[in-house]
């Protein structure tokens, strides 16, 4: 499978400022609704609460392909979420699991460096598979 056309997982760990959890849940809900309506390449988009830390949350996202991630980053409601995130959260850290094309990694390095978003890329080894039925 061409790296540009491979599905992958993105995990974003968010730490919300004390006293801002309800506000953050509101912007997360707004972003989630917009993503569901405008991003067919986002196969799964969840915002989960840490069971041990009321200020810690995790976005779990599954993308159909590289183009879907680029569309997500460029989606105006997601960009608006990013601006509000800066006001309401202490941090965000991103991890990507799967295979991305080099040009996508270059795009992420530029886009997220400007925003100060740290990310770590876990490239797929030769072990693993994706069921074709998920992409049909």
Regions found by a protein language model. Name each.
Residues 1-57, 64-74, 88-136:
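Short S/T/G/P-rich N-terminal loop/turn motif that feeds into the first structured element of a domain
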């Amino acid at each position: 499978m061409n790296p540009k056309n491979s599905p992958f997982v993105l995990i974003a760990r968010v730490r919300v400022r004390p006293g801002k959890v309800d506000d953050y849940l509101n912007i997360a809900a707004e972003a989630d609704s917009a993503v569901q309506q405008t991003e067919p390449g986002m196969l799964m988009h969840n915002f989960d609460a840490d069971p041990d830390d009321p200020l810690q949350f995790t976005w779990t996202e599954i993308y159909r392909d590289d183009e879907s991630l680029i569309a997500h980053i460029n989606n105006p409601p997601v960009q608006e979420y990013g601006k509000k995130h800066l006001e309401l959260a202490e941090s965000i850290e991103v991890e990507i699991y799967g295979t991305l094309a080099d040009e996508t990694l270059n795009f992420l390095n530029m886009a997220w460096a400007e925003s100060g978003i740290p990310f770590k890329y876990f490239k797929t080894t030769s072990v693993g598979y994706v069921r074709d039925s998920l992409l049909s």
